[in-house]
Swiss-Prot record:
It catalyses: sn-glycerol 3-phosphate + NAD(+) = dihydroxyacetone phosphate + NADH + H(+); sn-glycerol 3-phosphate + NADP(+) = dihydroxyacetone phosphate + NADPH + H(+). NADPH binds at residues 18-19, 39, 113, 146, 262, 286, 288. GO terms for biological process: carbohydrate metabolic process; glycerol-3-phosphate biosynthetic process; glycerol-3-phosphate catabolic process; glycerophospholipid biosynthetic process. The gene is gpsA. This is Glycerol-3-phosphate dehydrogenase [NAD(P)+]. PROSITE patterns: NAD_G3PDH. It comes from Photobacterium profundum (strain SS9).
Length: 338
């Protein structure tokens, strides 16, 4: 373990996958002491040997001030601020494990995008259940690909929290990376919802391209997908303006148009005729949109929100519908006002 652990720790990042690693690298790039925690001790030991995450971010060396650990108690106790970057289906479990080690002044931000499996709850509700209502919470969301962030390419994102001081501190800490710009946003609900819905629409955009449709179809899916995001957001109490920003339109365009997106690549495979299981195997990493689709469609039904694109994607993923048939049914819908 790096001796910098004896110095002040700016932040602890919980989750040593591609995105968690890239965020830790970005935070530590200009000298800030950052802990990157992972649950797999062997994986963390290999990262320490390589001083890089060769599996997910090959060729990107870790800054000296990046500290690796598989010791959850040490990682949580070392820093006031925790940044959780784990898949949505284990988000609550990780926070439950974190709770016994929290400091009196601990604050938790997450960059996880999605909803709680089975319940469809926003992650804020999951976090409160796991650690209590007294711990300050924040969400970081927006258009970010791990490889570009780790390479130091310019990136912009947004952060939201009911705690204004926490937002200001997060902006200050993340801005230290010089190429990572962070906007503040007061819409805590919309900031959480956007990342889940865009995953679903990105699968649809990939399916469209996999079938062989062109840019016209992809753009129509993005535009009408944004409308679905706004309608569901309104039903849950979010602000429409949020979905015109980083956590909505920004993230949606990014993941629908670039093959760095796992959700888009998953959709491409489905559009090319592969089964759901084979498409997931081909990706080789968590495809958040697969689970998100089920939860987003359940929310749409619960709140009576019309989301035809999400419905068709749900039918492809969970009811065995062919991607071409889904596209045909979308195009055959009754004419309506935009």
């Amino acid at each position: 373990m790096n001796q910098n652990v004896n110095n002040a720790i700016t932040m602890t990042v919980l989750g040593a996958g591609s995105y968690g690693t890239s965020l830790a690298i970005s935070l530590a790039r200009y000298g800030a002491n950052v802990i990157l925690w992972g649950h797999d001790a062997e994986h963390i030991a290999q990262l320490e040997i390589d001083r890089a995450n060769e599996a997910f971010l090959p060729g990107v060396a870790f800054p000296e001030s990046l500290i690796l650990s598989a010791d959850l108690e040490m990682a949580v106790q070392a820093s006031r601020d925790l940044l959780v970057v784990v898949p949505s289906h284990v988000f609550g479990l990780v926070l439950s494990d974190v709770k016994p080690f929290l400091r009196e002044d601990s604050r938790i931000c997450w960059a996880t995008k999605g909803l709680e499996p089975e319940t469809g709850r926003l992650l804020k509700e999951v976090a409160v259940d796991a650690v209590g209502a007294e711990v300050p919470l924040a969400v970081l969301s927006g258009p970010t690909f791990a490889k570009e962030l780790a390479a130091g390419m310019p990136t912009a994102i947004a952060v939201s929290s009911p705690d204004d001081a926490f937002v200001e501190d997060l902006q200050e800490k993340i801005h230290c990376s010089k190429t990572f710009r962070v906007y503040s946003n007061s819409d805590f609900i919309g900031m959480q919802l956007g990342g889940a819905v865009k995953n679903v629409i990105a699968i649809g955009a990939g399916m469209s391209d996999g079938i062989g449709f062109g840019a016209n179809a992809r753009t129509a899916l993005i535009t009408r997908g944004l409308a679905e995001m706004c309608r569901l957001g309104a039903a849950l109490g979010a602000q429409k303006e949020t979905f015109m920003g980083m956590a909505g339109l920004g993230d949606l365009v990014l993941t629908c148009t670039d093959n760095q997106s796992r959700n888009r690549r998953f959709g491409l495979a489905l559009g090319q005729g592969k089964s759901v299981d084979q498409a997931q195997i081909d990706i080789g990493q968590v495809v958040e949109g697969y689970r998100n689709t089920k939860e987003v469609w359940a929310l749409a039904q619960r709140y009576g929100v019309e989301m035809p694109i999400s419905e068709q994607i749900y039918q492809v993923l969970y009811q065995g519908k062919d991607a071409r048939e889904a596209a045909k049914d979308l195009l055959a819908r009754d004419k309506k006002y935009e």
